[in-house]
């Protein structure tokens, strides 16, 4: 079930990579992004020559936030989930460090449509900026309609359970209506769409906590912090937001057939989890993944992993 991750040897420098003239500075989301094309030959075999990548920087307040995208990719691989490959990178001209994220669809024959575009048709007043109306029941209605009309490949219930499981493990609080969506094939009008890989995973892993302020945290402090984590979406329009674990539990109760696969995804040890990301802390980056940040991420992952296993 696990996916072998693409592992870089060194931090990639994109200073001489071609900037995408069509996309330029990518407008979607809160963090600055540039679209660039990988050179030929590529710096390492894990990079596909000529392919578009997103150079996604951190929020200014949290300069090492980009590491969350890279760690999340590795965690997704351990779970056996489709997450766009993410690498540590920088631009030697600007000095910016960022996550370098592989584009997850082929522009030549595919199109990506954000779920928010469809949800806005269900609720004409849907607030795309705040996303407070984003809820699972509306998502279910949309996906069921697509599936009945043969517009979507089967398996959407398992996809959502897996997404909630992944977000609960990494502590992602930002799976809003534009952070998931559909990939359509342009050349095959009658072909069903598929749900996109789990992209945009950087609002996670305690990125907003400064390591010098958590170095004395007790086990109770970690438990308290983890218990406050919530998903971005709600169960229904009238429900409040729920904690990472409780919303996943509710979805598992709704779709019991998804439980076996979801539980099997957690079949790894803490040592395997640590080993899956340990090499990142050894990369020589201008903004490194420090040992303090690395240990903090691991402690959070360990806490959440224990809570998730208790569900199965």
Question: Where do the PLM segments sit?
Answer:
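Aromatic-acidic/polar surface patches that form glycan- and anion
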Residues: 25, 64-68, 158-159, 290, ...
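Non-catalytic, well-ordered alpha-helical scaffold segments
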Residues: 70, 95-98, 158, 163, ...
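ATP-dependent phospho-/nucleotidyl transfer catalytic cores
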Residues: 104-164, 280-282
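C-terminal catalytic region of ATP-dependent kinase domains
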Residues: 186-312
């Amino acid at each position: 079930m696990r996916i072998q991750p693409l592992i870089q040897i060194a931090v990639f420098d994109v200073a001489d990579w071609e900037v995408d003239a069509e996309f330029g500075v990518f407008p979607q989301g809160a963090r600055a992004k540039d679209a660039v094309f990988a050179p030929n030959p590529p710096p390492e075999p894990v990079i596909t020559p000529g392919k578009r990548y997103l150079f996604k920087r951190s929020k200014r307040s949290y300069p090492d936030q980009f590491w969350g995208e890279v760690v999340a990719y590795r965690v997704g691989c351990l779970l056996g989930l489709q997450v766009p490959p993410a690498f540590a990178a920088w631009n030697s001209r600007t000095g910016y460090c960022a996550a370098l994220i592989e584009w997850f669809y082929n522009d030549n024959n595919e199109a990506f449509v954000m779920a928010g575009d469809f949800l806005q048709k269900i609720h004409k007043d849907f607030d795309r900026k705040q996303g407070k109306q984003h809820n699972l029941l509306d998502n279910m209605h949309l996906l069921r309609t697509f599936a009945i009309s043969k517009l979507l490949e089967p398996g959407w219930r398992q996809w959502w359970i897996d997404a909630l499981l992944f977000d609960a493990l990494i502590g992602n609080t930002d799976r809003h209506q534009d952070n998931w969506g559909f990939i359509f094939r342009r050349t095959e009008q009658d072909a069903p769409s598929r749900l996109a890989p789990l992209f945009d995973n950087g609002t996670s892993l305690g990125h907003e906590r400064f390591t010098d302020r958590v170095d004395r945290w007790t086990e109770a402090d970690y438990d308290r912090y983890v218990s406050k984590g919530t998903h971005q979406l709600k169960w229904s329009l009238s429900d409040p937001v729920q904690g990472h674990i409780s919303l996943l539990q509710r979805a598992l109760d709704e779709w019991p057939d998804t439980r076996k696969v979801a539980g099997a995804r957690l079949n790894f040890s803490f040592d395997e989890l640590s080993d899956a990301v340990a090499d990142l802390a050894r990369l020589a980056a201008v903004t490194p993944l420090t040992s303090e940040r690395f240990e903090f991420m691991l402690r959070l992952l360990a806490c959440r992993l224990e809570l998730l296993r208790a569900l199965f």
